Amino acid sequence: MYERVYVSVGSRAPNFTLKDENDRDISMDTLRKGRKLVLAFVKGIDDAHTREQIDYLKDDFERFQFHGADVLMVTSGNVKFNRTMHDNHKLPFHMLSDQRCDIIRQYGLYNEYNKLLGPAIFVLNDAGVVVFMSVGKNPWDIMEDEEIIKVLEGDTQTPPGWPEM
């Protein structure tokens, strides 16, 4: 059964705090610090699709930073899994554990059969507003980084009339 999407383009992304690959509490808003953010959700399993999404984001990390964005990844895996993936792939960004799928549910990505619908990418502007989202229905629905870069290059400022943080 699929749950409805709770976050959409134009809405403020809900903040959350989860454990990172080193078992430290990381808050999305604290990490973001008023910068743009590429927020990625992947399954907590070590398969070809998860590795592909991780490697895409790692390979273009410097390009994301050039455009003023950080990267944060949320998985349904535990801290130990995330530590292994983080170390094996030498990731320059944090992997957060949402093993109970609380945040995955909050973002409308939960599927009771697989825990996560498919890989998902949310791009947040500097005010924390979602300016782009891509939610895969299958594990192989992996977002191309070029599309993310185009979003970051474009106007991702807060829409007029949106409350300041």
Residue ranges and their predicted role:
Residues 1-165:
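Chalcogenol-based redox active-site neighborhoods
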